[in-house]
A protein has these predicted regions:
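Conserved pre-ATP/AMP-binding loop-to-beta segment of ANL
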Residues: 14-17, 132-152, 159, 182-188
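Conserved AMP-binding/adenylate-forming
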Residues: 24, 39-84, 400
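Conserved AMP-binding A3 loop
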Residues: 27-29, 148-172
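AMP-binding/adenylate-forming catalytic core of the ANL superfamily
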Residues: 63, 101, 348, 353-354, ...
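Conserved AMP-binding/adenylation subdomain of ANL enzymes
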Residues: 171-188, 196-236, 250
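Gly/Ser/Thr-rich phosphate-binding loop
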Residues: 235-239, 248-307, 320, 327
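Conserved ATP/PPi-binding loop(s) of AMP-dependent carboxylate-activating enzymes
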Residues: 314-318, 328-363, 399-401
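AMP-binding/adenylate-forming catalytic domain of the ANL superfamily
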Residues: 457-478, 497-499
Length: 499
């Protein structure tokens, strides 16, 4: 059957529930009707159909309809994180050569237009009670090699890189998740993570491919989600550490009857939280993935969830993983682990093969192995344990924060001589941002926050600032950030600036 995955579901299962938003619901047939109306509307707006369109929107039915409509038109969708600053958005639009921007916020249209050389239009509203524009479905879409979505992720130097994700990548990811979690059309996946993140978009794509339903939320609200789970409105939910810690106090002692799995991503979580989940009969599936891998490529098998607390899991269907150990990795051995620690490298159909504009081509070797930059090890049973993420990447509340971005922003203040940004363990957020500074002169922490304003998004702001006499360094002069997170840090901290 040719055409889109939505067309396929609407033909085979027209009355099957596809999508929920509060008290509203759409079958696959109703969803297709709405999407076709949106496709016709956008088609009429474009003088010449673009190859790529950016979308600036938060979770909503209109965002879902817009994404699917653009795919029906054969257009690549660049998803913009709405929490970024104007400067960050402007860079992404220009780097992706995106001439059209669709925005959900009417007041933001002029602002977004000023950031691009092209045109901005307001996201369409639902065509309820109006004449639905005609649309002729396109058959030559959803091809494996076609780019479906583009998301930006920072590199280890902090420079954002565009990740083109093909329908083939998304297909491999959806089918691997289906096999691991035994997903059926009876499942309903609760999605309170942003659709502009791969964790959110992948849920929508699983629905289209596998025929399950999605209950979408504008944002995460622990009380609302607990109420829906108590009412049996979901069987699987995707959460990050912060969401899980907020939800946990609202979970009954015997858990939720309808909830099969909590898929946990977005970085580290305290083992104490996972143990509390076990006590409440919650099956937490830890996972490992990233934008470049179209969501999870490693996950715990459900039957091992309670036994392997702390592990990210085993590779999913079609994914190959190796630990590249060489001389550079020797100093990462730990007393708790006797297995060799090295860089996690991946290969498989869910993994993108390039960055936009051919950035960082060295991350793929000639055999297609992708070098993640993350450090980890495999235990005797082949379970992956991640030691550190993407060369000191901080993941706080599910958001990726690269230290280099924050460090460069801090160095704009003349009082800051050196800056080293690290992620500190945080039971609520997974990790929180801390900045260690050497100073040219005394400074109040509020002045540091004022310096960051407008340079980087608020979620990247450090929660703690430390003044250090000197940075711990290697013989070659590189800052030893791991010492700033160890007990030895007391030898370096002079004072905590924001206390």
């Amino acid at each position: 059957m040719t055409g889109s995955w939505l067309q396929r579901q609407a033909q085979l299962h027209p009355e099957r529930p596809a999508f929920y938003w509060h008290e509203k619901s759409w079958s696959f047939a109703a969803l297709q009707k709405e999407v076709y109306a949106y496709a016709a509307y956008y088609q009429a707006q474009f003088v010449d159909q673009p190859n790529r369109v950016a979308l600036f929107s938060n979770n909503s039915p209109e965002m879902v309809f817009t994404i699917l409509a653009l795919w029906e038109l054969g257009i690549e969708v660049q998803l913009l994180n709405t929490r970024l600053t104007a400067a960050e958005i402007s860079f992404q639009l220009q780097d992706a050569h995106c001439d059209w921007v669709i925005t959900a916020d009417q007041t933001a249209v002029s602002d977004v237009r000023s950031l691009t050389f092209g045109q901005a239009i307001k996201q369409a509203e639902a065509f309820v009670g109006s004449v639905v524009p005609s649309f002729v479905p396109n058959e030559a879409i959803y091809q494996a090699e076609q780019v479906a979505s583009i998301m930006y992720t920072s590199g280890t130097t902090g420079n954002p890189k565009g990740v083109p994700q093909t329908f083939g990548n998304h297909l491999a990811s959806a089918e691997a998740t289906q096999k691991n979690l035994a997903i059926t059309s009876e499942d309903c996946w609760l999605c309170a993570v942003p659709l502009y993140h791969i964790s959110g978009l992948s849920i929508l794509l699983r629905s289209l491919r596998l025929g399950m339903s999605v209950r979408l939320y504008e944002r995460f609200d622990a009380g609302e989600m607990a109420k829906d789970l108590e009412a049996g409105k979901g069987t699987i939910v995707s959460l990050v550490a912060k969401m899980l810690t907020d939800l946990l106090p609202l979970v009954p002692q015997q858990g939720f009857d309808s909830l099969r799995y909590i898929l946990l991503g977005g970085g580290p979580i305290a083992k104490s939280v996972l143990e509390k989940c076990q006590q409440k009969l919650l099956s937490v599936i830890q996972s490992y993935g990233m934008t470049e891998t179209c969501s999870q490529v490693v996950a715990l098998p459900p039957e091992k969830a309670s036994e392997k607390i702390g592990a990210s899991g085993v590779t999913l269907q079609g994914v190959h993983l190796r630990i590249a150990t060489d001389g550079k990795m020797a100093d990462h051995q730990t007393a708790e682990n006797t297995q060799p620690i090295g860089e996690i490298q991946l290969q498989g159909p869910a993994i993108t093969t390039r960055y936009l504009n051919d950035r960082s081509p060295q991350q793929w070797d000639q055999e297609g192995w992708f070098a993640t930059g993350d450090l980890g090890y495999l235990d005797q049973e082949g379970f992956l344990y991640v030691v550190s993420r993407a060369s000191e990447l901080i993941i706080s509340g599910g958001e990726n924060i690269y230290p280099a971005e924050v460090e460069q922003a801090l160095l704009q203040h003349p009082a800051v001589k050196e800056a080293a940004v690290v992620g500190e363990p945080d039971e609520e957020w997974g990790q929180s941002v801390a900045a260690y500074l050497t100073l040219n002169q005394p400074i109040h922490f509020q002045a540091l926050l004022d310096t960051l304003e407008g340079q980087i998004a608020h979620y990247k702001f450090p929660r703690r600032f430390y003044h250090v006499r000197e940075m711990p360094r290697t013989a070659s002069g590189k800052v030893l950030k791991r010492l700033l997170l160890s007990e030895e840090r007391v030898n370096y901290i002079e004072q905590q600036i924001n206390k």
